[in-house]
Amino acid sequence: MPLGIGALTSLQTLSKIIIGEANGFKISELKGLMHLQGQISITGLHKVFNAIHAKEVNLQQKKGIRDLEMEWSDVFDDSRNENIEYEVLEGLRPYEKLRSLKILNYMGMKFPNWVGDPSFVCLTQLTLRGCKSCTYLPTLGHLQSLEKLFLESMNGLQRLDSEFLRPINSHDFGFPSLQVLEFRDMQGWEIWSTNGGDKDVSFPCLCEISIINCPKLAEVAIDLIPSLEVLHIEECSVSVLRSLVGVSSSFLELSLKNIKGLTQLHGEVLKHLGSLEHLYVTRCDELRYLWESESEACKILVSLWDLRVKFCKNLVSLGKNEVNLDSDSGICLESVRKVELFNCPKLKSYNCPNGIQNLDIYGCRSITSLTFPTLQDLPSTLKILSICYFDNFEANCLLNKFLSSLGYLSIARVPNLSSFPEGCLVHLTKLIIRGCDNIESIPEKGFGFLPLFCLRYLEINSCKNLKSFPHEHLQNLTSLEELWIRDCPNIDYTFPCVLWPPNLTTLTIGGLKKPMSEWGPQNFPTSLVKLSLYGKNSGVVPFAKSEEDVRNRNNTTSSSFVVPPSLTLLQIHGFMELESVLEELHHLTCLEELLIRSCPKLRDLPEMLLPKLSRLWVDSSSLELRKKCGGRKAKYWPVVSQIPDLDVG
């Protein structure tokens, strides 16, 4: 902090205040700054050893402060004194019209009486974090306007009871306005009990509860909270779930992560979830089934439309009885519209709802099939289909079904895919085929290039045996904006210059069978703004400034890439003999990003373009070029040092 701040008596904005050592900024210097406004953060309060100095700051009279953060060090050692810190915090009572208050790493065993005082009628958000010595909380239920309460890393706190939420008057509600309540990293917390009093005294507006990393919490006995709609539980025991799920019948969202002891959602839990719309289950390693009975789940979860199960390594099936369920039985969660199943390696099958719209399955390597209870084809409602890392999945059977409704199709790392569907993908806007090593061709008729008027994104990537690709129809993709064709070493096409999609804005291409030096002349569309060329150990990238430049070259059959001046990003990767791109790139006056990878002989850059760049990356293979860019005495340093995103050494 600069010296003399305290003399600026008209100062209104001072968002960060750092208390210094003996010769540094002292908290008493804030005494005369009566006009401070808005958000104020005071850090280093552990360096205040005289509570009188804290009281002299007179925060209570600084009426312009609306958001206040008070922070001590997160190191709790012998240099700290809990009694002094209590007195300091007591002396820093703010103005009663405060909107937001954060108290961080305070060492006192208790809080001063002003924390939770009902006179703070405008306080809407309160955060108590890292106050590890605190053994009990003040009565916060008095705060009439409080909407959000965050309690984090209060390791000394073992019990929360009705005193925590007690209202001002016996006939009032505790926390009458609270909407969001979060407990996080409460390592010593064991009991949360509000029972024993009037059943209607607390949380009339509470919508969301989050309990995260509270491993010792075992006893939860709280009153009904009819307004509660969202429940997040993470790194807790299953008893917390069983207790909290019964406090409301209005749950819309339930998120469970790393719940110890959770083997399935038993009937005693399911029966409270009739209104549930979103169910998220993550990293529950003891989970083998989501529920005992598929038919029971169907009867209860009638509103569920978003189901996500991720990283549950022992999950065998969503329903225990589904293991032997006939796919024609018609039993499934018909209301579900969106399903994400990620990295559940033992999951063998999934019975999809007939009305599903979005199906995304990743890394479920044991799945061999997807079934639809009453349909022979994929449902007409399906808009998004993404399947990735399926070792034994019969992809050909699935993808040969009717696909006309799809708007997004992504197939990645599916080794059994050997052919592309022959259905007409008339509504497709995004298509990704990545890492499918057994597919050899994408037939013109089967791919349906001619009707793909809606396609905006096409990626064919890392398909090592792909040979046939209907490149001659690229020019018909009039809506295509982004095209990736990369690392397909058996594609033997040269992409004649007149066949590029006319409205292409992004092109990533390279790593094909024939090096770019043998492609012949290329005239990229004038709409192009991002170009990434992957030479895959090719010699040079044959840039040309214009078509006239191409005609003037001695060998008119040689490769020449005419890059449009509209380009804003250029990436050059894997051109082993490329030495210079000086003249060929001077016309790229709109260029903002230049990325160079694996071009070991490149020694020069288009110097006149460098001042306009916002991003320049040169990797370690281009040793000579890096020397010219790195260091104050380097050739390009005066210019490149001004580039915001620079990586040249």
PLM regions and their residue ranges:
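Innate immune receptor modules and recognition interfaces
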Residues: 1-649
